[in-house]
Amino acid sequence: MDFGFFWVTAVTTDGQIVVANSYGLAYIPEGVNLPEQVRMASADESIPVGERAKWATYPILAVQGWAQHHNLRLRAVVATEDQFKNFDPGTAKVTLQADDIPESGKMQGRNRLAVIAPDAASHLASVSAGGLSELLPPAPSDTNPPADETAKLWFEVMKPMMSTNPDRGVAHLEAFVNYSEHAKEQALYRAHTAREAVAQRAAIADWIYWQHLSVLISDSLAGSAAK
């Protein structure tokens, strides 16, 4: 269980659906898909990245900020009672009970790469199995796997979520950059060593995703510091 991780959903008065979660910017857990009509607040490139950084760890702020940027009004915000604590969504609240939350969050729709980098996802899907390796940089001469520090770095991502400091978002995003760089390196190794095209394509998708996320969050920290 990822400490402090949760999703918030909002519906605008014109029927649009926007979601946000409490981790990173444009972070979507592996295997989670978003339906085509659902927008992700922190992945919206029409909003300055420094502005999106201010929402980090506070998804209710994210859906409010997204609506404000697009000159839209929220009809309702959906979250649990705990998630509404200390936050007034400024509109109708739909409080989820434990029975309302499905055991599996699997949905049909766009994978995480398609959400944050649709052009890259389309290009990857169009590449034949034989051409996948051409998308990669040359493999290093050292064929040993890189040290796996995933658990340690992910704990650093979670640690700020244990704090009530309202400025915890900066520490959280800084840790997320480190994690993203590590995840990118791990995915690239898997892409170089995969024996099956399906596994290689999945590893390349992860490599591109974490590459985009690392750049996005680094830029968000620079953008927010400049203000």
How should these model regions be labeled?
Residues M1-K227:
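Secretion-targeting segments and adjacent low-complexity export tracts
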